[in-house]
């Protein structure tokens, strides 16, 4: 249900994040989002116009990515690249990838090499990885038998600017 909710939000033009329990779940969910968006024509499917990320997934125009390390040499309007920043890809060039920040709309030119070593697909992540991320709407999937500490639930439940939804399965 959390995945379906995120797809519906994306169809409304919203940036989304699905927070899951494990890295394996996150990778599978990210792959699922990419394939779904490609099937709808919402992201680039041509392998010649995509770039491989450090998680092994290929993304292109229209896809959402998250930065996983700080990089002072990559800047936009005086602001440096920081771990947790989320972007929508606008164009994949030969050397650089044009992106828009989901947090503030700023435009970034990010070297392909950095995406290959420092970025992952940004549709899903673990609660530990979501700190610092901002999207329009967030869905949180926790196992019903887990004793998730309150501080982690707070972190997970404060990623969406407009809405945050919790699902227990």
Q: Model-predicted segments: where are they?
A:
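C-terminal accessory regions
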Residues: 69, 78-169
């Amino acid at each position: 249900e959390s995945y379906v909710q995120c797809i519906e939000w994306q169809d409304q033009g919203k940036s989304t994040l699905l927070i899951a329990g494990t890295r394996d779940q996150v990778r599978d969910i990210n792959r699922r989002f990419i394939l779904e968006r490609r099937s709808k024509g919402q992201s680039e499917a041509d392998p010649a116009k995509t770039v491989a990320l450090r998680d092994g997934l290929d993304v292109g125009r229209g896809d959402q990515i998250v930065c996983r390390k700080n990089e002072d040499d990559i800047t936009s309007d005086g602001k440096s690249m920081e771990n947790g920043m989320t972007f929508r890809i606008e164009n994949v060039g030969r050397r650089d990838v044009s992106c828009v920040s989901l947090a503030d709309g700023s435009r970034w030119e990010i070297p392909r090499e950095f995406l290959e070593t420092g970025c992952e697909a940004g549709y899903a992540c673990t609660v530990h990885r979501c700190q610092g991320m901002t999207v329009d709407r967030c869905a949180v999937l926790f196992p019903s038998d887990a004793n998730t500490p309150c501080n982690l639930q707070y972190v997970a439940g404060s990623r969406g600017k407009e809405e945050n939804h919790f699902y227990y399965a």
